[in-house]
């Protein structure tokens, strides 16, 4: 080292770093600092700026003395000669710490990479599962919809119900309506439906099988039904209902002329003909009201009291009249034999269906037109019956009270065949409500059990044999003209 009094001196710097040794000259005036020395060493050895190193020098004994401050550098310059030998010692502990930190960072990077890979795999799996479930959910409704379509097509392809089942239901739907119509509204059937529709086939014609089968389920009425209803009045006979669901016989209020034939039912036919009645009552009831109340549509002239004389075929359905000498059980008719004084056979068949209609205003006071002697019509009783024995009907028929009885049906004055104002049947006119009591000339047989005695017709009431005692005058006001009227 060069000593000078303020003069610049030069010092040779020898620096060592591991295997690298370098020399340089330092020009200073004994004012060199440690920082200047560190910068020169870094520049000389090409050390990085962030390098953490320590400078040490060798003294005279050969020891390495650390240069930590500027005073240490000044002492090294005074004690050493013209050459300053500096050794660069790098702090390995700090470097090792940094290296460890770097390794940890690298490990962390690897771990993060692994986690990212696992997360990506999980995300892919979840996305795949979700996609699979979504695809399954989307495909399942399509399959069910397809199944529904196939099921619907199978239903559409099924054949319709067979036609016989529909045909089998037709009688069940039609017949109750007919039955209900004739059961619940018996008085209005003739007014609502034309008379031609009520025509029932004569007894000699066979009723179709479909009607027999449709109405065969209803049992025929028992025999005890006839005569079960008590008479409303003791003066006239009451006739129970026969095979028809109609209002009770006790209702003798004066209804319209069209409804009277339902209230006054026909008397029961002879006991011998119950088999024919019980075999066909329901068929007649469901088809035509004239058949309900005693027989087919009339073929004779109209009677005075609104009835029609039944044709010859009426006896075939309700039974033929009994033989001679035997009284008829259905109406108490006398036998045909001369000792009894009754009318000839055939003049007292089954009673007409509408035999007790209320008389019309035009039917009183005049004799009826001549009638035919068709078999089955009522023959008038003889003239020599006891007067006053003609049973008058009750006053509920609507006729004014007459001198002959409560109903105004008493006998007319003797010899007056058609006196005005008389309500009884005229001379020679049929009008007897029943057979006269036995004993007189022309008396009928005793009435059956359960029927009250019936009075005899007034004198002069006999008509032509075979004539209709219930024939009414032509063109009676308030009555419908039947197409079968002769």
Swiss-Prot record:
Low complexity bias (residue ranges): 283-294, 302-319, 345-365
A GO BP entry: endoplasmic reticulum to Golgi vesicle-mediated transport
GO terms for MF: identical protein binding
Keyword field: Endoplasmic reticulum, ER-Golgi transport, Mitochondrion, Transport
Compartment list: Endoplasmic reticulum; Endoplasmic reticulum-Golgi intermediate compartment; Mitochondrion
Compositional bias annotation for Pro residues: 218-234, 366-395, 433-460
Keyword Endoplasmic reticulum: yes
All copies of domain PB1, residue ranges: 10-91
Required for interaction with sec-16A.1, as annotated region: 1-195
Top-level division of the source organism's lineage: Eukaryota
Biased composition (Polar residues): 235-245, 273-282
Keyword Magnesium: no
Function: In its hexameric form, promotes the accumulation of sec-16A.1 and the COPII subunit npp-20 at endoplasmic reticulum exit sites (ERES), also known as transitional endoplasmic reticulum (tER), to positively regulate secretory cargo trafficking from the endoplasmic reticulum to the endoplasmic reticulum-Golgi intermediate compartment (ERGIC) and Golgi apparatus. Required for the assembly of proteins, such as the GTPase rab-6, at the Golgi apparatus. Plays a role in negatively regulating cell death and promoting cell and body growth.
PANTHER family: PROTEIN TFG
Subunit relationships: Hexamer. The N-terminus assembles into an octamer and the C-terminus forms a dimer thus the N-terminus mediates its oligomerization, whereas the C-terminus restricts the full-length protein to form hexamers in solution in vitro. Interacts (via N-terminus) with sec-16A.1; the interaction is direct and is required for both the localization of tfg-1 and to maintain the distribution of sec-16A.1 at endoplasmic reticulum exit sites (ERES).
Protein name, as recorded: Protein tfg-1
Species annotation: Caenorhabditis elegans
Encoding gene, per UniProt annotation: tfg-1
